[in-house]
C-alpha cells in the first residue's frame, strides 16, 4: 500500500528518531512511504492561540502539498492529525478550499489507528523488556477517538508489562499554548500526572503524541526520575 507521511514540526526538528521509526515501521508492514517535500506546519500553535486568520496561508500550503495523490496520510501525532482534520471548518468561508481541505482531512490517519484498522495488524513483532505505562493524549483519545488501538499494539510487545495508574486519562497539562498561557496550572497538572504514574514504578513512559511526552519528560527530569520516555513508534520498532 502506498502512503504519505506527515512528519510534523516536532518530528522534523526535535524527535527525528520518532519520525524515522514511524517510517521504518510502515515499511516493515509492507507500505511504500512517500514524503511530500513541500509539507509544512499544520498551524496548530497559531490556531490554539486564536490566530485563525493568520494560520490560513499555512493551512493552504499544507493542503496543496498533500494533494499530489489520493493515498492515506499517516501522522505520528494526534494533535497535528486533529488540527488538519479541522481545516474544513476554518476554511468554511472559502468553499473551494474547504472542499480541498475536506478531501485531505478524510485521508489523514493516526499511525496506530492505521496499523490496526486499515492494515489489520495487532502484533508487529516488537520486543521490549520492562514495566511501562501508557499516556493517552487528549487529542488522540478524546478528539480522534483513538483509545484501544495503541494499547492493542503495546499488549502484543513481547516482554513488556503494561501497567495502569490512577487518573491515567487525565490531561498532562500541555495543551499546546495552554502550557505557556497558563504555566502555573499546567505545571501543577503535569506534576500530578507524574506523581500518579510513579506510584507504579515504571521503567518506560509510552505515548503516541510527542508534545505530551516532551511535557511529561521535562517533569520527570526535574524530579530526577529514571524513566525512559518513548514514542509508540520507537517501542514498536524495538527488537
From Swiss-Prot:
One Gene Ontology cellular component term attached to this UniProt record is: cytosol
Name of a matching Pfam family: CCG
User: Which top-rank group of organisms is this from?
Assistant: Bacteria
GO molecular function terms listed in the Swiss-Prot or TrEMBL record = L-lactate dehydrogenase activity
Tell me the protein family, please.
Belongs to the LutA/YkgE family.
* PANTHER family, alphabetized: LACTATE UTILIZATION PROTEIN A, UNCHARACTERIZED PROTEIN YKGE
Cite any additional comment in the entry.
Answer: The E.coli ykgEFG operon is a clear homolog of the B.subtilis lutABC operon, however it is not able of restoring L-lactate utilization to the B.subtilis mutant for lutABC operon. Thus, ykgEFG operon may contribute to lactate catabolism in E.coli, but under conditions other than those tested, or alternatively, the ykgEFG operon may be responsible for the catabolism of a metabolite other than (but perhaps related to) lactate in E.coli.
Official protein name in the record: Uncharacterized protein YkgE
Q: Which organism is it from?
A: Escherichia coli (strain K12)
The gene is ykgE
